[in-house]
Amino acid sequence: MLDRSQFATNLLMCTVTRLKACVREIDTVARFGGDEFVVLLDELALSLEDSMAQAAVVAEKIRLALAAPYVLGLQRGGADALAVEHRCTASIGVTLFVHGEASQDDILVRADAAMYQAKEQGRNRVFF
């Protein structure tokens, strides 16, 4: 029998690795809860148009990275017993803000609303 918690843990660890590979060192990747993550991009362009373009490039890079197949090794009795291929999609909500413009909670609410718009439009997409 497969250990589902081990599978979930392995998947989350691989997801974090992929997310971190898509952003710069100055950016932040954090697990928000369950299967939700927050990515904060720092020092984007000053103009709204350029910032949106930069964020869109990173969001699409993340979407594609997360869509690639995961091959997860699972153990039984302490030894690798099985490799499972798994595929995920990502619905990504993006919001732009200037430091100090809104509370942390307000920013997360806006990003969450954008994510649900992405899901409503068919999942596996980016929405601003």
Residue ranges of predicted features:
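A short pre-motif secondary-structure segment
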Residues: T28-R31
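Active-site loop/short helix in cyclic nucleotide turnover domains
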Residues: M1-F7, V23-R24, L40-A45
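Catalytic-core segments of nucleotide cyclases and related cyclic-nucleotide turnover enzymes
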Residues: E49-A56, L82-A83, F97-R123, F127
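Alpha-helical scaffold within the catalytic cores of cyclic-nucleotide enzymes
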Residues: T15-K20, S51-D80, D112
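Residue-level recognition of strand-loop junctions within catalytic nucleotide-signaling folds
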Residues: L40-A45, A67, F97-V98
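A short glycine-centered flexible hinge/capping loop motif at secondary-structure junctions
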Residues: M1-A8, G33-G34, G122-R123
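PAS and PAS-like sensory/regulatory domains
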Residues: H86-S91
